[in-house]
Regions:
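HotDog/MaoC-like acyl-thioester-processing domains
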Residues: 1-66, 72-75, 163-164, 175-212
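Hydrophobic beta-strand-centered segment that forms part of the acyl-chain substrate-binding groove
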Residues: 4-8, 12, 137-169
Length: 212
């Protein structure tokens, strides 16, 4: 992925890279889920392991440094290797974030499914994964959809109850801004209601403070 995708701003090239590598990442996500849930016998596991190791070696023959962040025509960065939204990262669910262009508070949301790979307590999403998703959504709101360089200063998560594996929704917005700081809030919910709430402070780094 690194060799094929290094800081491109060409929409056609981005489309090509996504079309090539995103299905591979999705196949690996499916493999991860199958690995967790399989009850195959020892012979089946040994056969699967041999195939997986062979494929891994094949992919390692063509590698370079991780891909850089690239941009589409609207100047919004496309981090394909991001751990939350990266279409080409099999660790990412991936989450697709939507922004309300008419919202003054930078409101954004995402609906997604977390399966067995994200489990903590049996049947529930790991609390750290909940925090990961909330951190990202709050950051999306604070940074105006990844168009402003802001980084997490602090984030506080309040867990109201266990978050079940399955379909979820996350929503975030900016509560207020003070100079180089943006204060964001958000929540994670399932069909029964909110499972976790978060608030965070996002800070513009020193090198970006002269940028309008």
């Amino acid at each position: 992925l690194g060799a094929a995708f290094e800081g491109s701003s060409d929409d056609a090239e981005l489309d090509r890279v996504e079309a090539t590598y995103a299905p591979l990442a999705e196949a690996v996500r499916d493999l991860i889920d199958a690995t967790i849930q399989t009850r195959a016998d020892e012979e089946g596991i040994l056969q699967a392991r041999a195939v997986i190791e062979a494929v891994t070696q094949s992919l390692r023959r063509e590698q370079s440094r991780p891909c850089e962040v690239s941009y589409r025509g609207d100047a919004r960065p496309i981090p394909l290797a991001n751990a939350v939204i990266g279409q080409c990262n099999p660790i990412a669910p991936p989450v697709v974030v939507h922004h309300d262009p008419d919202a003054a508070d930078g409101r954004c949301w995402a609906e997604f499914v977390l399966g067995a790979a994200y489990e903590g307590p049996p049947g529930l999403v790991h609390g750290g994964v909940c925090a990961l998703v909330l951190d990202h959504l709050l950051g999306e709101a604070a940074s105006q959809g990844r168009t402003q360089p802001l980084f997490t200063g602090t984030i506080t998560v309040k867990y109201l109850r266990g978050t079940p594996l399955g379909p979820l929704r996350c929503e975030a917005w900016v509560d207020r801004t003070e100079g180089v700081k943006a204060f964001a809030r958000g929540f994670l919910s399932d069909a029964e209601g909110v499972t976790a709430q978060a608030e965070g402070v996002f800070i513009k780094p020193a090198w970006a403070r002269e940028v309008p």
